[in-house]
Every structure is written in C-alpha cells, then in structure tokens.
Amino acid sequence: MENIAPALLEWFYKNQRILPFRTDPSPYHVWLSEIMLQQTRVSAALPYYERFLAALPDIPALAACEEEKLHKLWEGLGYYSRVRNLQKAARIVCEQYGGQLPADYDALRALPGIGDYTAGAIASISFELAVPAVDGNVLRVFSRLYNDPGVITEPAVKRAFTARVMEHQPPEKAGDYNQALMELGALVCVPNGAPLCEQCPLASLCEARRAGTALELPHKAAPKARRIEPVTVVLAEDAEERFLLQQRPQKGLLAGLWQPLLWEGEALSAEEVCARLEALGLACEGIEPLPAAKHIFSHIEWRMSGYSVCVGSAEAPTGCVWASREQLQNEYTLPGAFKAYKKKLGL
C-alpha cells in the first residue's frame, strides 16, 4: 500500500477541530486532555478541561492540590482513578523531573496512569518524537484500511497494527500524523453506524471499502458479563437539614469518595434500614422509599433501592460526616453513580 501520510495530513490541516490543547500543545495540556478523553467525549470534556486548568495551571499546582478540591474539579467526569493517578504522576514529576514532564517515551510510560497510547500522544505531539499513539480510533482506521479481521483487543494484533502505523509515519511530522489518524477515526471512520467514506482522504486505498466489509470491522473480543449487585442507598437527613455522608475505602471501587449511607450486596426493607440506622446510633423518625435506580460500572451493575429517612440529631458515626446542602454543592464530591438521588440532596 502506498504511504497514506500525504493525503491524511492534507485532510487534517484542512478539517481538524480547533481545540485548546491543539492551540497550545504543551506537555501538561496534552497530558490532561488525553486523560480526560479516555472515557469522555471531546464536547463533554472541554468545560472540565478549561475549569481544571484555571484552578491548577501547572504540574506543581496539581501535585499540591488537596484531595477534596481535586475530586470536586473532576466531579461529573467519573472514573476517579484517572485523576488520582494524574496527581500521583504529578508528584513524581515534581520530585524527579523538576515539575516538567520528561521528553522521553519510556519515562512517560513509567508514570502512574500513563499507558502506551498516552505516552505516545505526549511524546509525539508535545516533544515531536517519532513514536506511535495508537488508540481505538487508530485501530479502527487500520482495521478497515487493510480489511484486517484481527481481534484488535488482542495484544499481538495491536502490536501488528502499531507496526503498520509506524510504516506510514513521517518522523518529522509524527505528532500531526498521530493526531490526524485519531481525528479521522473520530470524525469520518466512525465507530457507530456507517463510516463516512465519501469524506475520507484514504477511501481510494481502503481495502474494506472495496470489499464492502467496513461495517463489520474492527473485530473485538466479546465483553465479559457484568456482575449484578443489589445495593441499598439511604439519604439520612437530620433536623438541621444535613445529610449523612460516608467515605469509601481508599482502595477499590470509587476509592476515597463520599457517598450517602450505603449497604452493598443487600436490598434492605424499610424495617431493616431502620434497624441498621439504630445500630449506628441514629433514631429513625420517618422513612419513605425512593425510586429504584441502577448504575453501570465497567464490571459491576448496581441495582439500587433507595430510602429517604428522617433521623434524630446525633453525632456522625465513625467514617461519616454531616453535610449541609451548601457543603454538598461546594465541598464534597458525590460520584455519578448516585445521580438518581442528587435532586433529593439539593444537587
């Protein structure tokens, strides 16, 4: 196959989206944008990106940020392990590299939360190093370009695709080339629905287009079944209109975040909820059920039963705090898993 870079780059320079991390592709900006975009659409991530940079304009500021403020800045993006790893990496960068990301692929790859793709994106876009940056968009483009039925989630197949990506990469324009492939996958060689082949600069070279197989590609491994878990959520409110929050363990699902009272693995009745509250030293003065809800994590699906409970004034149990509606809005971060109950909390 002839080299795709000339046609691809010509298309990219004419059609690329104007994005703040392209206008200023400094290492910190590219890093932050790539972490945010791992599980979030560009349009949804941009307001968070701007707000985050306004609050934490450089790596030392990120490294020094208090945990609750950091979580609040990330609130709404979900997958909070991303921002925890971001801060861990920032602290290492401050300790080992003087607060500046290293211009070295392997050193970037060694930082928490930075995998092959993110290291490649930073190294090629910010430091102009000739390395690959292969994400799902790029794998889809090359799967169709070569009409390759390989399962792209398999490491050996991904390595083979990466080698093909590098065969076409112009070393002097590695960052633009990598971004152009990602942009082509995001805007033209799209994942859902028919690819927009009539807009594609590589259409004349695309083997899947000729074979009529573009809609069938790429091939992925079948996803693992999620575990269904019953959960009981309790919005306990005292006479001062404060809600009881508990902090999750520092490791595991939603690590370190705040949540309403929660019992995992159990769908409790109203009587059982009152008994549990009384065991915590909280008098149950009134209880009403809330609509059932569910939340899907990557490997678990919570089926939530909810209750709104009025309780007598008391000290917060160990690991819990009382929070006013104002504090809930400005200080504490509740994960999106509790979206169905946030209106009741005044959020």
Regions found by a protein language model. Give the residues of each.
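Catalytic cores of DNA base-excision repair glycosylases
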Residues: E2-E198, L202-A211, L215, A283, ...
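Intrinsically disordered, low-complexity, charged terminal extensions of DNA damage-control enzymes
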Residues: M1-I18, T23, A186-L347
